[in-house]
Structure formats: structure tokens, C-alpha cells
Amino acid sequence: MALVADFVLQRLREWGIERVYGYPGDGINGLLGAFDRAEGHPEFIQTRHEEMAAFMACAHAKFTGEVGCCTATSGPGAVHLLNGLYDAKLDHQPVVAVVGQQKRLSLGSHYQQEIALEQLFSDVSEYCQMITHPGQARHVIDRAFKTALTTRSVATIIVPDDIQEEDAQPSPPKMHGSVFSSVGWSRPRMLPDEGELRKAADILNAGEKVAMLIGQGAAKAASEVVEAAELLGAGVAKALLGREVLPDDIPFVTGPIGLLGTKASDKMIQNCDTLFMIGTSFPYAEWLPDEGQAKGVEIDIDGRMIGIRYPMDAHLVGDSRETLKALLPLLRRKEDRGWREEIEKDVREWNDLCEKRAGQHFEGKINPEAVASELSPRLPDNCVLTADSGSGTNWWARHLKLRKGMQASLSGTLATMGPGTPYAIAARFAYPDRPVIAFVGDGAFQMNGMNEMITIKRYMDRLAGPAPFIFCVFNNQDLNQVTWEQRAMAGDPKFPGSQYIPDVPYAQYAELLGLKGIYCDQPKKVGKAWDEALASDRPVVLEFKVDQEIAPIPPHIMLAQGKKAAKAAVHDPEKAGIAAKGMRQKLSEVAEHLPGRHHDGE
């Protein structure tokens, strides 16, 4: 007779789960035995750490649209999952975690590795339940999946060690208290009220300078977004999680918005008279219009979040695609295209400026912007791009120009360090024939990326070419994003005790594991290094020794931030090098092209 552990995996299969990311431990011994008997249906993918398993489950959901799944043992293994699960929760991704627990008999005795898991997972999970009876497994699993899909969030199933080894009850006895659930779920067709649609159309039709801001919630509405932009003569800015919704070769797509955004996006938002947000919860008020400057229309599937980021005049709660399809017939084409032409001109000027900056190298060191700039025209069709959190994310956001069919993601809301590498691994497992390229800082690579190269070594037969699989490591021996934040936001000089990190031969480490390692420290060889990496049939660690003193300058510079940065520079340990390179000239060169917003209050 099958055990509860076998039934759990069978039910996961019925819900479409093909692989479960995790790390073994005695709290899930029953499940591990069931994985062995399941013979790869679903398969167990062993990561180096449970946090990486949760990141991979989140990435699977992001890149496939399916539920991601991870597992961990009781106690410490369960605790390790949390950061990756919060990444899924905050970026609205459906993930189911299956977690072990000590035997029911021992619970409440302060037993070894006993943790109150239902309390531990209560905040990160929309649904968290412990299975205490074999007949309960069916409906707990089913409800976990239905909840994860409906809420686009995390559900956690806790399975005590002894329950895993009991005989399964696929169909519990028909008696009072028994529950008989089913596998299945369908996405609802959500549309706003017709009156609100007409109100939204009136606002958009009246606007003379319409700016559109889209996020990942617009992912299935690309053609409708383009049609709306064409009718309204609008430009389209993208929140980072919405990078893949529209390709960057559309002339009126202004690129990312915010601290890592473009001048074109910032200028459009600053000067618009109507803001149209679609499928995004972009939170930063300093990058949105001033209150009262613009009329607002928003589409969001979650009514709890609509009108929260900017005061809206029309609130369209519904699916982005269906709502836009209902709205489009109500929109009138704007004959005056002056606003659109201005936006397209700003996009061209920003792209020219980025190209110019990427070509500036100092003292023979590689400008990190050039790493992204050289890759952009070389990007393979249909590739998947991931980024970690750090200064390299700036160059990933600004210099990589996505084309149709490409996918890209990062930890958008949690903005945690560490997901760039596991995201890429999950993407490769999901799409073994697609090129996958990760941008990772040396800090994040030391934090966990190096360990996950061992995961790649273990599954080399699955993850190797012919499609490129590349981990681009920015080696600047500095936790660079935080260093610049210390300077600009706190007015403090760089503190080497917290910011310096050891120099590690990342490319050589890759070779030690049987991967391909490529090292580049010369500006004129950046393009050649990319060509070599893209031609490899082995996973590649491509290490660039880059200049740590290239500032990730935002699209507009707050006066207060400029003052603090100047104050920090006086006592900065790198002040000699910064001065020698003419950092002031580099900053002023960019600043003269940027919009003002130089208010003391900012």
C-alpha cells in the first residue's frame, strides 16, 4: 500500500509539478523515499541550501507561469526557506512549500529541531496547514495549490515525520468531518464596472500628455498595451518586474523607471498630465508625478492595492488584458503627436548618452557599464536574463535592450541579495534549450552563488549547452551599491570595514569545478570575452574586473543627495582615485543632460 509521502508526490504530479527544489534532512525522510520510488515524476533537485531552493521555486513561477515547489526538513531547514519564500510573496508568485516536522508524539516537548512551524510560516503564507491525519492530505494539498494560484502567493504544507510513513488514504471514509476535494483551478475573468471604464476613457481621452507605467501584471496584455499607447500618443515606462512585457526596440518604450531607470522615463513622468498605471505597484513617490500634477487611471487585479501609490481618478479592478480590451473601443486616437515625438527623441538621446558613458574607461579599468553595453547587441534570441541586487543591476536595467521573446527578472520587491544565480539555474531547468545569462555582483556571488556552481556541476549533463549558460560576475571587491548609498543617502564616506570584500579568482574556481571560466580585465577585450562565453557549450563563469568608482547615477539627482555625496567625498578612502578620474566631471557631464528636481526638501 502507498504511504502518505507517496500520495503527496502523486498529488503534486496531478497539480502539474515536474520538479521540486530542496535539500534533504531527516524531517522529510519519508518524502525522500517517495521521491526515489517516484523515479523522477516529480524529480527532486538538490540545491546547496534551502534558501536557494525557495528562490528556484519562485523563479520557476516567474518564468513559466506555473506553481513553483520547494521542500525542506523540519527546524533549521524550514527556517532557511523563508527569505526565498518572502521573495515569492512580495513579487506575487505562486509557490507551494512542503516542509517536514517532528513526530506528532513529540510536539510540545521542546524536542530537538521542534519549531512552531505554523507560526513561523504564518506571515509569509496565504495558507499554512499541518497534516495530522492521512485522510487530510488530499484537501490540504489541493487547498494549498488553489490558494497559491488564486492569491499569487505562498502556501505551506507541513507534514510530520510519522504521518509521512503512514498508509495513505486517497479517499477518506465517508463520515462527518471528511472532506473530498479535487484537483483543478481556472483563472477568473475579471472586469471593472462599465461606468468606471467610461470614466477612465474620458480621462485618458482628455489628457494631452499621457504617460503609461506598466508592471508584471501587464505580461499577458502586451499587444493591448501597445494599441492603447498608439491611440493615446503615450510613452510606456516599465517597472523592473515588467521589463519583459514590451521589447525595448519599440521607439516609445522609455525603459525602466526609478533609481535604476532612464532619463527618458523620468522626464516623461515629470511632465505628464495623465498617468496610466497597468499591473504595477511601483512604490516610489519621488519617481511619480507630484500630487495634483496629473490625472490618474489604474488597472490592477488586486483591489486592495489600487490607488495606493498615486491618487487615482479612475480605479479599474480587473485583469489587465481583459480590462484593456474593454477599454480600447472607448479611446479616441490623438491626432497631435507632439508629445509622442518628444518622448521618442528623449529615448534616442538617453540611449546615445548611455553608449557614450559605457565607452569611458579610466586608468585602464573596465567601466562596468561597458559589460552590459557590449552584451546587449549580442543577446541571443529567446534568452532568459536574471539579475542579482547590487550596482550591476543598474547596468542590467539600463543597458540591456530586450527584444521580443526574451524574459528577464530579479527580486523586485524584497530586493534581496542572492537570487540571481538560483533564478538562472531554475530558468535553465525549465528551458534547457534557451540561453540563460545572469548578472551577479561579487558580493552576491560570494554570499551564495559560488556554492550553487556546485549544483551546476552535479547536474552538468542537464544544464550544459549548446545554448549559452553564463554567470557574469562583476568583480570590484566592493559591496558597491551600498557604498554609493552610504555616500549619497547618509553623507558618509565608504567604510572599508563593511564594504570591502576579498578578491576571489571566480573564473579559476569555475574551472576547478569543470565549468568554463573566463577572466577579463581589459576594456578592449570585453566584447571578445562575451563572444567566447556565448560560444561555449559548457556553463560559464565570466569574470570582469571592473572599476568600483563608476557611480550608478539615478536619472535625476536630488540636491540633498548631491550635498551628502560631496560631504562624503571629503573623507572617503577612495577620494584620491575618484579625484584623479575626474569624478566631478563625469557627474556633471551626466547631470547637465538630466532633469532638475533639485529641491532642498528632496
Model-derived features with residue positions:
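Active-site diphosphate/adenylate-binding microenvironment
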Residues: A5-V8, R13-E18, D26, L31-D36, ...
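Active-site phosphate/pyrophosphate- and oxyanion-stabilizing loops and adjacent acidic/basic residues
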Residues: G33, C58, Q119, V226, ...
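Flexible, glycine/charged-enriched surface loops at secondary-structure junctions
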Residues: V154-T156, G215, K334-W350, G364, ...
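Active-site beta-loop-alpha junctions enriched in small/polar residues
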Residues: P160-D162, G390, D547
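Thiamine diphosphate
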Residues: V98, S106-Q113, G307-R309, H315-V317, ...
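Short beta-strand segments
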Residues: I158-V159, T386-D388, E543
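Active-site nucleophile and cofactor-binding loops and adjacent substrate-binding regions
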Residues: Y23-D26, F44-F55, C70-P76, T132-P134, ...
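N-terminal alpha/beta PP-like core and its mobile active-site loop of ThDP/TPP-dependent enzymes
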Residues: M1-G338, R378-D381, P435, M460-F471, ...
